[in-house]
Amino acid sequence: MPTIQQLVRKGREQLVFKSKSPALDSCPQRRGVCTRVYTTTPKKPNSAMRKVARVRLTNSKEVNAYIPGEGHNLQEHSIVLIRGGRVKDLPGVRYHIVRGALDTAGVNGRKQSRSKYGAKRPKPGQAAAAPAKGKKK
């Protein structure tokens, strides 16, 4: 425990905030170019083939970014928009690709949470014609 005189001389050291998405440089999103698009497997209790892209950002940093949703049109040299947000079961993946922005297409046939996946609003007539995946009448 410091004395009052020691506190007058030195003061308390402020805790430094450490960013969870340092490659964004305090920006909400960043543009980048895909250098590699691949699938990888998650950590121990989970099992899947997660879609991931290696992206070179405009600030010349390289990051791994998750491609959310079912199916995607990304390949090498695609221009993508990156936002922060990690994937808990993929070590080293701290960013998400924004669907429906730049070269990334939205998710086809998405009815719910459309804004998160860049899906357009379905036309009123089409809603009844195409039943959702996995649903039975």
UniProtKB/Swiss-Prot annotation:
Span list, region Disordered: 104-137
A Pfam match: Ribosom_S12_S23
GO molecular function: rRNA binding; structural constituent of ribosome; tRNA binding
Biased composition annotated in UniProt, kind: Low complexity: 124-137
Gene3D superfamilies: Nucleic acid-binding proteins
Keywords recorded for this protein, A-Z: Methylation, Ribonucleoprotein, Ribosomal protein, RNA-binding, rRNA-binding, tRNA-binding
One Gene Ontology term from the biological process aspect of the record: translation
Modified residues (3-methylthioaspartic acid): 89
Cellular component, GO annotation: small ribosomal subunit
Sequence ranges of Basic residues compositional bias: 111-123
Subunit structure: Part of the 30S ribosomal subunit. Contacts proteins S8 and S17. May interact with IF1 in the 30S initiation complex.
Family annotation (NCBIfam families): rpsL_bact
Family to which the UniProt record says this protein belongs: Belongs to the universal ribosomal protein uS12 family.
Role summary: With S4 and S5 plays an important role in translational accuracy.
Record-given protein name: Small ribosomal subunit protein uS12
Source species: Cytophaga hutchinsonii (strain ATCC 33406 / DSM 1761 / CIP 103989 / NBRC 15051 / NCIMB 9469 / D465)
Gene name of the encoded protein: rpsL
